[in-house]
């Protein structure tokens, strides 16, 4: 196994589950690398809508996991392989990779280093930057699982993507186009509409002000074939009235309220968990063409935050933004390691206010 160059690292870790006040910048040991794992020097980590759920202990309860503290957050990440386990053959130190680290027992990607099972790691596909790749994994896999496994999307089918300017949605638009579908997208705000048009959707409406059902019927006069729903509520259910009889609807587990399509339409929740075959298929789609007029696959980054501003990144999850938020891990690490205030928690009070 190639040797790592340092024994400790900076990480955003929890000593208990709870609110923002539990997130502290700590100095922790660099995780040991198992035989079927790789050690990634993390450059970027995605900040997802599910991260507060994990921070509050939701995933530990959901999966029946006994948590080990300090608990490092971060389900998405990208960087460079620093070391590989003895049984790893397909990847090597120096490879640029992205990784899934959801409820990883050795810690997530809100850290300088992460040890992750090789089955959950892939070389970065296409022309994606490390920043884009670090923001992408869970949302891209969730979009892909919905389109491919759950909906069985076919070329020339019409699809409604509700929440098309969000993390999952803006990636689903591009994947659906690469699968040959006709995409009717519902975005949030004029900026969201502009983004989704740029990403190649065939038609885009603003979910806050447009008549979605009327526009959908104009787009697909015989009714929409399928729908991928990433946000629930009255507007979603009204949009689903434009589905054809026998249509198919999918939504990731956790979408609330759950969508309620008309009778006669199949509606399934699903999980977006990765496996090596799905990761390979996702990579091939990313590297393929999205059709005439479409550019390279894009992971839209709304804002980036340095590692020691992870709390601000979590606060930003409740604001209006397009695409994804990220933490820049490999950012001025000398400052993080030398600043004496970092020996103490980032927060002094229970209200999460900076010291």
Where do the language-model regions lie?
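Glycine-rich beta-strand-centered segment in the early N-terminal region that forms part
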Residues: 29-47, 59-103
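Glycine-rich phosphate-binding loop and adjacent beta-alpha segment
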Residues: 231-296, 329-342, 347
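Mid-domain Rossmann-like dinucleotide-binding core that forms the NAD(H)/NADP(H) cofactor-binding site
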Residues: 134-209
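Glycine-rich cofactor phosphate-binding loops and adjacent beta1-alpha1 units
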Residues: 194, 199, 203-268, 354-355
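C-terminal hydrophobic helical "lid"/dimerization subdomain
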Residues: 2-7, 279-355
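Short glycine-centered segments of the SAM/dcSAM-binding site in methyltransferase folds
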Residues: 96, 158, 247-248
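NAD(P)H dinucleotide-binding glycine-rich loop of Rossmann-like/cofactor-binding domains
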Residues: 66-68, 75, 90, 100-163
């Amino acid at each position: 196994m190639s040797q790592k160059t340092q024994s400790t690292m900076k990480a955003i870790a929890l000593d208990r589950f709870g609110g923002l006040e539990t997130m502290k910048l700590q100095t922790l040991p660099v995780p040991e690398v198992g035989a079927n794992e790789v050690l990634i020097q993390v450059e970027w980590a995605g900040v997802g809508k599910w991260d507060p759920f994990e921070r509050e202990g939701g995933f530990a309860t959901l999966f029946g996991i006994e948590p080990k503290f300090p608990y490092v957050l971060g389900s998405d990440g990208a960087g460079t392989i620093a070391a590989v386990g003895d049984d790893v053959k397909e990847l090597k130190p120096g490879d640029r990779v992205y990784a899934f680290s959801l409820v990883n027992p050795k810690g997530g990607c809100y850290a300088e280093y992460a040890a992750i099972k090789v089955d959950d790691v892939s070389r970065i596909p296409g022309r994606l930057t490390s920043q884009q790749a670090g923001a992408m994994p869970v949302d891209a896999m969730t979009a892909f699982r919905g389109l491919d496994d759950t909906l069985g999307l076919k070329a020339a089918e019409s699809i409604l993507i509700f929440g098309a300017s969000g993390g999952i949605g803006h990636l689903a638009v591009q994947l659906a186009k690469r699968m040959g579908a006709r995409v009717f997208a519902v975005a949030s705000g004029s900026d969201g509409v502009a983004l989704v048009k740029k990403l190649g959707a065939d038609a885009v409406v603003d979910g806050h002000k447009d008549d979605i059902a009327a526009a959908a019927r104009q787009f697909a006069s015989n009714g929409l074939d399928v729908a991928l729903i990433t946000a629930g509520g009255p507007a979603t259910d009204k949009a689903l009235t434009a589905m054809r009889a026998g249509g198919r609807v999918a939504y990731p587990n956790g979408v609330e309220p759950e969508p309620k399509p008309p009778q006669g339409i199949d509606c399934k929740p699903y999980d977006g968990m990765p496996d090596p075959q799905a990761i390979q298929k996702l990579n091939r789609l990313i590297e393929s063409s999205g059709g005439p007029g479409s550019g390279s696959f894009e992971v839209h980054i709304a804002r980036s935050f340095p590692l020691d501003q992870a709390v601000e990144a979590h606060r930003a999850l409740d604001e209006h933004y397009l695409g994804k938020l990220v933490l820049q891990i490999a950012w001025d690490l000398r400052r993080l390691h030398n600043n004496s205030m970092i020996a103490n928690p980032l927060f002094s009070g229970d209200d999460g206010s900076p010291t």
